[in-house]
Amino acid sequence: MSTRLGFVFTLLLLYWFKTMWAYTVDFNLDIQGFYQVFLAVINPIPLSLLFIGLAFYIKRTKLFYLLSFSIYVILFIWLISNSIYYREFTDFVTVNTMLASSKVSAGLGAAALELFRPWDIIYILDFPILAFLFLKKLVKLDPRPFNKRASFAVTSLSAMLFSANLFLAEIDRPELLTRGFSNYYVVRALGLPAFLGYSANQTYMANKERSKASEVDLKPVEEYVASHYAQPNPETFGLAKGRNVIYIHLESFQQFLIDYKLKVDDKEYEVTPFINSLYHSNETFAFANVFNQVKAGKTSDAETMIETGLFGLNQGSFMVNYGGTNTQQAAPFILSKNGYQSSAVFHGNAGSFWNRNTAYKQWGYHYFFDASYFTKQDDTNSFQYGLNDKIMLKDSIKYLEHMQQPFYTKFITVSNHYPYTTSLIGDEIGFPLAETQDETINGYFATANYLDSSIKAFFDYLKASGLYENSIIVLYGDHYGISNSRNPALAPLLDKNSETWSSYDNAMLQRVPYMVVIPGMNKGKVIETYGGEIDMLPTLEHLLGIDSKNFLQVGQDLLSPNHSQIVAFRSSNYFVTPEYTSYSGRTYYTKTGEEITNPDETTKEQLDKIREAANLQLKISDSIQTGDLLRFYTGNDLGKVNPDDYSYNNSMKALKKIEKEKGDASTSLYSQKGNQSTVDLFKAPSYKELHPEQFSSSSSSSDDSSSSSSSSSSSEKK
């Protein structure tokens, strides 16, 4: 290390070691065979040598050491950022993600700290050691500069190594960079610095795509939409026509929670009793095989799909990157053209989170009630992702009752949000924790139980106020709550073996609830049809008697007998059908979970056909989204949203003004009740009030112990 060359190669070795640590401990790169191991071992070297080696061109001693170490620190930050990001998103940081970071960082706070692990000390151990060596002058600065020829030789060597790396990577995975198989393929083959360049190019191409798009690009889109359209089921078309629409967003809620009973100390606890009752009600169309189709945009991806019938982006969040600029024909705007008088979103977090306050205007939402409209947040009523659900729902009533009917609304809950250890406070603590080595999993069931009781309180209000009978209530889970990296720890709770846990099991855990409650209907049932979030909008439209035929949407009505049942995940070549599941580069029989390793020709043809259909659906959606093609579309009479028509300031004043102007013609609940408020009809008892027997005597000591553990965990996380 006492020479310039030695110092650079020391930094190179340290970066290589840390990368190997990340590949082994944090990333799931599905490395198989000697060839892929070899690629993974060599890929950190070429570009790190290229970048750190740039310092060889510097003659001044201190500047050489400062520059080389600074480049090393930048590479380190990129590595550790991806390691932490991967733990939650099971993906890598893209340029779009970084560009959007200011829009999604509000409210993250302590949740980011939850992603750190004890072994992260490995990533930073070298910094104090290097500082000690230089401060004690155990390593001396080398004043001898490299000549230009030697410096260029290092640059050339790194370029040759990268070329060789790329050549070998193409042998392992042909068209690696052109077909965009998966981000982890690129990282596995070329490393994180190369992935950053790949991502930057993808972002540039996306922006370029929009600038060069024209009306001509609409033709294949319109042809696809026409051929993909699924005729509505005549038995369900218009079944809920004219009713208020109430969407309830079930944060991080996975399908396996339905009917699940958590066993603690030989006693079973039903996690979501009320939601279970809705699932099995004859007033509910409940879907057993609907999958989330989100990627890094997570909640924003889910919102994009249910509102627009189009996918989120392969990289980053559509709402953040395009939501405030693209022309869109979303549900609130469509319904406003079909007799709906008002629309609103209720969400107890900052309006800027996921760029909602801008994207919602492009979607045509009349009102957006964010955290500024609700009870002031403090340690007793909220956590880093917003106001707790019961309080948010109660605070929403004073606005909801003034909305003109029929209305279209969405309530975004947050309490069942990662890390599941900080949102429950005081008398809401009591549901037992699971008993695994993962605190995130342990708390997941308690926060889901809290969400369940919040939803019950809201339904009770709807019934007491009279809104229930004239509404259609749609409940949906937005994305997974337990990430794939944690699923093996979850496995025993699902009667599965952690050692044999597979990509098939991960795929099946992408199911999320989708329930359509139509009060007064007796045709409800549990439906086994396979579908995804992309299908929710056309399903709702047809239930409301609005034909989706002339809308540029790529989903299909889940109640249609013509529904294709091909579910495309956002990652290319990931899909699920009733017959086959393709996930993380492996293919399985969906019914049995048996891996297909040597498919016959018939099976190959079927898989190729499904893969082509899934990828085409994503391609068509992406062309609409990245090309902003709806700005050219004239295939319906909706027209275009003017975002300047909407303001989310002083919304209560605006609601009351409309009531006053309409007078006796006002259709708001407040007007219908003779200008009497219904706020007091909302009752949301705490867990302690709902389960007094659990706290009333010493005979319940085991349950009290669980509660105490939960309280302690919550305090520690705060």
Listing of model-derived features with the role each one plays in the protein:
Residues 165-240:
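Membrane-interface segments at or immediately adjacent to transmembrane helices
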Residues 225-718:
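Solvent-exposed soluble domains appended to multi-pass membrane proteins
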Residues 41-42, 190-205, 252, 470, ...:
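Conserved acidic functional residues
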Residues 83-95, 114-117, 208-217, 299, ...:
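A diffuse structural propensity rather than consistent per-protein peaks
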Residues 36, 59, 63-66, 80, ...:
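Generic, low-specificity signal for short hydrophobic/alpha-helical stretches with a mild N-terminal bias
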Residues 1-199, 689:
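Transmembrane and membrane-interface helices of multi-pass
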